[in-house]
Amino acid sequence: MLTRPHGTILLCSIANFINSADQVVMPIAIVAMTDEFKWGLHGQGWVLSSFAVGYMSSQVIGGSAAKKYGGKKILLLSVLLWSMSTFIVPFFAHSIFALTLSRMVLGFGEGLGLPTIYHIFSHTIPCEERSRAFGYLVALGSIGQTMATVICAHLNWRWAFYSFGSLGFVWAFIWIYFYKENRSSNDEEFVEPPKVNNINVHWSEFICHWPLWSIYIAHFCMNWSNYIIMQWLPTYLLRSLNGNKSDIMLTAAPYVLNSVVGVVAGHFADSLIVKHKWTVLSVRRLMTSVGLMGPGLFILFFSAVNNLPLAVLFVTICLGLSACNSSGHLSNHAEVAPSHAGITFAISNTLATIPGIICGPLTAELVTQSHGRWFPVFIIAAGVNFVGAIIYLSQSAASQVL
């Protein structure tokens, strides 16, 4: 049985691989689906954003349920739910209303996943290995996005949903057989006890501490630009930079670099703490600064060029640097709230999903009002990143507050 940290990291990272792959299928497939069903730009925006409605609604449920019933059961439920919802998309594609509902269910299932994984990691992964653990988690997610981008470009859009929807069922069998929770309780054992074991915390405590809000805001700002890239990059390359369908494969490049940087940044961050004796707070602030300010700068470069290869290069660097956040604010939950990391991440991810809901329709409206120009979309995204970095640098902490 895989009870050791490395086995836990592997299985959870594979789950995130499938999670991230399933998220990318629709932004790729929607180009062909739009040609077949004659959807307008606003219709596409709502289809893309409906996922985020379900995703946001289940974050706190996932963190709380994992704490009460154990991570194994909730992560299994999450993967099965989002996999089924991916598999059945072709059956609902004839109706935007039905498709929107199925996308919400997909989002609800995926929304249970990451808070549950954070709960599992905070209870089973030692502090000095957490940056690497979250680095691998993010890296496998990026690899999933990369593979989905490349494979979906060569598949009929219906088979794209069938193929990636099936992966979760295979993972479920492996998870049931290999992952074993502590039988003595519904909760995994802490690998290191928290300084203060605050089991019963009032809900108001989760929104009353600036170190927590610095994490929430940084996560929100990171996702603003990430959602724009994930949702609209294929459409932008095809419609604005005159790319062709084979150029869609170029959108895999950002996810490749993201996966590499996620792993490298994790090892680098842990080495700063263990070998070079940096404080945990200094490392979290450094990695978050690079992960927010770097993408903010390169998304401005991306918006200023009309050359497709150069645009892909800039957006690749943008998403690559964003992976540094996995060793920054995304790893900070287990330090400020070790007993409640699943719930704090759920709150953070709920707020960070708001851009996923509004960026689709907002982008469509901004581009329409700007007569096809995308610059306002990207300048806002860059500004949001810079604001997030400043707030995290000034308000973050690495000591326990809950």
Located regions from the model:
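Residue-level signature of mid-helix packing/kink "hotspots" within the transmembrane helices
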Residues: 24, 52-60, 111, 145-146, ...
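C-terminal ends and interior cores of transmembrane alpha-helices
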Residues: 80-94, 289, 293-306
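Extracytoplasmic
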Residues: 7-41, 229-234, 359
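Extracytoplasmic gate region of multi-pass secondary transporters
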Residues: 26-27, 209-266, 325-326, 330, ...
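Conserved MFS/SLC helix-loop-helix module at the cytosolic interface between two early adjacent transmembrane helices
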Residues: 57-97
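Helix-loop-helix hairpin linking two adjacent transmembrane segments in secondary transporters
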Residues: 137-183
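Cytoplasmic helix-loop-helix junction between adjacent transmembrane helices
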Residues: 102-141
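Hydrophobic core of transmembrane alpha-helices in multi-pass small-molecule transporters
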Residues: 85, 97-112, 298, 309-325
